[in-house]
From Swiss-Prot:
Its main location: nucleus. This is Transcription factor Atoh7-b. Keywords: Cell projection, Developmental protein, Differentiation, DNA-binding, Neurogenesis, Nucleus, Transcription, Transcription regulation. GO terms for cellular component: axon; nucleus; perikaryon. It is found in: Nucleus; Perikaryon; Cell projection, Axon. It comes from Xenopus laevis (African clawed frog). InterPro entries: ATOH7_bHLH, bHLH_dom, bHLH_transcription_factors, HLH_DNA-bd_sf. The keyword Nucleus applies. Gene3D superfamilies: Helix-loop-helix DNA-binding domain. GO terms for molecular function: DNA-binding transcription factor activity, RNA polymerase II-specific; E-box binding; protein dimerization activity; transcription cis-regulatory region binding. GO terms for biological process: axon development; neural retina development; neuron fate commitment; positive regulation of retinal ganglion cell axon guidance; positive regulation of transcription by RNA polymerase II; regulation of transcription by RNA polymerase II; sensory organ development.
Length: 138
């Protein structure tokens, strides 16, 4: 019958459960290494996620440049932006069958000066005209 305690000369890593106190340093060392590896993987995962959010923030319209959007706000803005673009494409497809110029006229007629100014962050109406092509070129 084999004893549960390690035989003299066996290494601490070969200990079986239940383990005497002499095996504890080897077990702690192993669990510490695993924890450090898991922490490093999680840190890399979070860095990748943060990089992805930074990339998304660059392409999502932002009302003000004074503060960075939170992750939640970034996702909300991305969803709204995607839905708006989908709506525009659907309408464009519907109007392209009849008169493509009518679709453009309809959208530009509905743009209010205040909306343009607040979106572009400008105060003067003549500045708005300068930014309109940039706004709709994406």
């Amino acid at each position: 019958m084999k004893s549960d305690s390690p035989v003299h000369g066996e290494s601490h890593t070969e200990c079986q459960s239940p383990c005497p106190l002499s095996c504890m340093p080897a077990r702690l060392e192993g669990s510490t290494k695993r924890r450090l590896a898991a922490n490093a993987r999680e840190r890399r995962r979070m860095q990748g996620l943060n990089t992805a959010f930074d990339s998304l923030r660059k392409v999502v319209p932002q009302w003000g440049e004074d503060k960075k959007l939170s992750k939640y706000e970034t996702l909300q803005m991305a969803l709204s932006y995607i839905m708006a673009l989908s709506r525009i494409l659907t309408e464009a497809e519907r109007y392209s069958r009849t008169d493509p110029g009518e679709w453009t006229k309809m959208h530009f007629d509905h743009i209010q000066e205040e909306q343009c100014l607040s979106y572009m962050g400008v105060r003067c109406p003549r500045d708005c005209d300068r930014y309109l092509p940039q706004t709709f070129s994406h």
